[in-house]
Amino acid sequence: MGKPLQVGVISLFPEMFSAVTDYGVTGRAIKEGLLTVSVWNPRDFTHDRHRTVDDRPYGGGPGMLMMVQPLVDAINAAKQSLGEDTPVIYLSPQGQKLDHSGVQHLSGNDRMILIAGRYEGIDERVIKQYVDAEWSIGDYVLSGGELPAMVLIDAVSRLIPGVLGHQDSAAEDSFASGLLDCPHYTRPETYNEQQVPPVLLSGDHEKIRRWRLQQSLGKTWLQRPELIHSLALTDEQETLLNEFIAQQSSGE
């Protein structure tokens, strides 16, 4: 077994991360020693009786900002635990958009500290002095960085060897090949007069492989055509995609 992925999280709502630590794939990874998740609450590093972590922004404007001192002290505490050279990531709408390539890049780390902001964000001086990278999960605004942090943890954890039940599961996920996943079916064979495609019941592994590849190509062409344009398709993929497009045009 390799070194576990060690994740430190800076958050005002540590309890939210029980969704990661107690359930599903990530919860199992923690139980098996493949992943650790520790949370530091900036409120624990305040020095006033109100445990103040936010204040009004200079220059005016709506909302509040997370203050420097509690946030920096929480980051330093996380670094003391995980290592001073642990990269610090801020989950932010201004960050680089997280995709499969980004997840693969992040999976090369065995430690990381994630800052889950709240209110209108965090003081820019924290970003400039302590943050190594900013990542976003999409072009929209959430109430805080906790959900994006959990998304990142879940996505990266899936690439840790041994986390998924089947060794090929991560390799066959959507986007691992640059394509969307093919359709999947389980029992019963017929439901509401809809039948499982006969090829999946044939037992012919080569035909099944080609069908799945063609369906994956076709779904990507229909739903995310920009992904197709960014790929250098093999001769087989070109042939299968052209067959799929012809079938669509003929209404099959």
From Swiss-Prot:
Specifically methylates guanosine-37 in various tRNAs. It catalyses: guanosine(37) in tRNA + S-adenosyl-L-methionine = N(1)-methylguanosine(37) in tRNA + S-adenosyl-L-homocysteine + H(+). InterPro entries: Alpha/beta_knot_MTases (IPR029028), tRNA_m1G_MeTrfase_C_sf (IPR023148), tRNA_m1G_MeTrfase_TrmD (IPR002649), tRNA_m1G_MTases_N (IPR029026), tRNA_MeTrfase_TRMD/TRM10 (IPR016009). Disulfide bonds: none annotated. One of its GO terms (biological process) is tRNA N1-guanine methylation. Its EC number is 2.1.1.228. S-adenosyl-L-methionine binds at G117, I137, G138, D139, Y140, V141, L142. One of its GO terms (cellular component) is cytosol. Keywords: Cytoplasm, Methyltransferase, S-adenosyl-L-methionine, Transferase, tRNA processing. SUPFAM superfamilies: alpha/beta knot (SSF75217). HAMAP family: TrmD. Belongs to the RNA methyltransferase TrmD family. The gene is trmD. GO terms for molecular function: tRNA (guanine(37)-N1)-methyltransferase activity. Homodimer. It is found in: Cytoplasm. This is tRNA (guanine-N(1)-)-methyltransferase. It comes from the Bacteria.
